[in-house]
């Protein structure tokens, strides 16, 4: 059975400012760096062997800090990037017009092929993160990879493994530097394929990120 750990990046400046990030970027806050260090300590105890990270700056930095603690090599995979939020990226959530908020709601509420102008749909996101996850099955026997990605991307992945629609990720609270675990099992009795063992564990952290206190 293959165990895969999923980690959301540490808190960023735009998380604290409640700005839409998507595939745009902002640096980790001091809190975010500390969160990543705490994940690193946990990753070392979990026996992580590989770190596979989104190639965006906030995930790269989170992965680098984790790697320093557990001594793993890092590879980058653009398929683990956050949902492309198109023209709304860099905007403060509270500044959206009624029309812009309508675009966002269509996307997260499951409207068929809903997307923000210039962005991607939840189905497109689901397809690419599942392709990235499938690549883990090609790792050597005994591997225990840790994937560093983003809130919507990881929520979409966990939701769809559970058999829920991609937009159900809004019902999952995956805080900054939370750890989830999924397993790949082959069984004639239990469900074969990917199963969710845990989601959104923050027992290794001190406190939630600023943007999540307001949800």
From Swiss-Prot:
Could you list this entry's UniProt keywords, alphabetically sorted. Glycolysis, Isomerase
Q: In which pathway does it act?
A: Carbohydrate degradation; glycolysis; pyruvate from D-glyceraldehyde 3-phosphate: step 3/5
A cellular component term from Gene Ontology for this protein is:
cytoplasm
Q: Where is this site: Transition state stabilizer?
A: 150
State a single Pfam family of this protein.
His_Phos_1
InterPro entries named among the record's database cross-references:
His_Pase_superF_clade-1, His_PPase_superfam, PG/BPGM_mutase_AS, PGM_Phosphatase, Phosphoglycerate_mutase_GpmB
Residues that, per the record, bind substrate: 8-15, 21-22, 58, 60, 82-85, 104-105, 151-152
Q: Which GO terms describe its molecular function?
A: phosphatase activity; phosphoglycerate mutase activity
Give the enzyme's EC designation. Answer: 5.4.2.-
Instruction: Quote the Gene3D superfamilies the UniProt record gives.
Output: Phosphoglycerate mutase-like
The top EC class is isomerase
- Entry keyword annotation includes Isomerase: yes
Q: Which reaction does it catalyse?
A: (2R)-2-phosphoglycerate = (2R)-3-phosphoglycerate
Q: According to its UniProt record, which residues of this chain constitute the active site?
A: 9, 82
Annotated GO biological processes are: glycolytic process
Q: Which family does it belong to?
A: Belongs to the phosphoglycerate mutase family. GpmB subfamily.
Q: What is this protein called?
A: Probable phosphoglycerate mutase GpmB
Task: Identify the taxonomic lineage of the organism of origin.
Answer: Bacteria, Pseudomonadati, Pseudomonadota, Gammaproteobacteria, Enterobacterales
